[in-house]
Amino acid sequence: MAVGKNKRLSKGKKGVKKRTVDPFTRKDEYSVKAPSTFQTRDVGKTLVNRTSGLKNANDSLKGRIFEVSLADLQNDEDHAFRKVKLRVDEIQGKNCLTNFHGLDFTTDKLRSLVRKWQSLIEANVTVKTTDDYLLRLFAIAFTKRRPNQIKKTTYARSSQIRAIRKKMTEIMQREAASCSLAQLTTKLIPEVIGREIEKATQGIYPLQNVHIRKVKLLKSPKFDLGALLNLHGESTTDDKGHKVEREFKEQVLESV
């Protein structure tokens, strides 16, 4: 008889499966709250592993970024082509308090704006708000036909494009540098800056579809809990903020 391993003794019991544990039993659900700048405060829910040992659930949640359609935040389908980024800065009970982290256009909207027979003009500016948030704003605009124009094309000359771009950067710099991040958000929702650029450039070349297509947050100031709580109002459980009307207009300077 050959000396070797007894295969029968080494085998385990047949039919015994490894016990699987559902990972969702170790998770907790938290509500994501948008700032009171937006009409709808209740963004949704997020999951996180329950606090155990040295791993704190709050630390895992802080810094999370959520991308939400502005149409959902404002209950208005006209804003469906814009996406807002919200960053979790503080946890209060089972609520994640967020702050504005950026704005962007959907790809299909941007592609639908670009057409033949017109000039596309883009500008960007890096600006610091009054509460020390460093932002980069990207604007986009397109030329349109003048009244009673017969010519098919609406191409602007290079000198006109440079003049329009200069106006765009000046207006973006002025509007963003003179207000806080929350005030700038109220200007971005009804597209106040885009309308102001359109008015200011009428004398150079008429424009259409003028938008702040993207807002990028480059640097945030030191975290201030009081400022964040003020941004969310006195009650952090309130699901509604104040509505920003589309008809909101600011006084335009005569010298522009």
Swiss-Prot record:
Top-level taxon of the source organism:
Eukaryota
Gene Ontology BP term (one): translation
UniProt lists compositionally biased (Basic residues) regions at: 1-18
Show the InterPro entries listed in the entry: Ribosomal_eS1, Ribosomal_eS1_CS, Ribosomal_eS1_euk
The chain residues annotated with the modification N-acetylalanine are: 2
Which keywords annotate this record? Acetylation, Cytoplasm, Ribonucleoprotein, Ribosomal protein
Name the Pfam families for this protein.
Ribosomal_S3Ae
Give the residues annotated as coiled coil.
none
Disordered: annotated span: 1-21
Its subcellular locations are: Cytoplasm
Q: Any one cellular component term from GO for this entry?
A: cytosolic small ribosomal subunit
Q: Where is the signal peptide?
A: none
The text of the family note is:
Belongs to the eukaryotic ribosomal protein eS1 family.
This chain belongs to the protein called Small ribosomal subunit protein eS1
Give the organism, scientific name: Aspergillus niger (strain ATCC MYA-4892 / CBS 513.88 / FGSC A1513)
What is this protein's gene name?
rps1
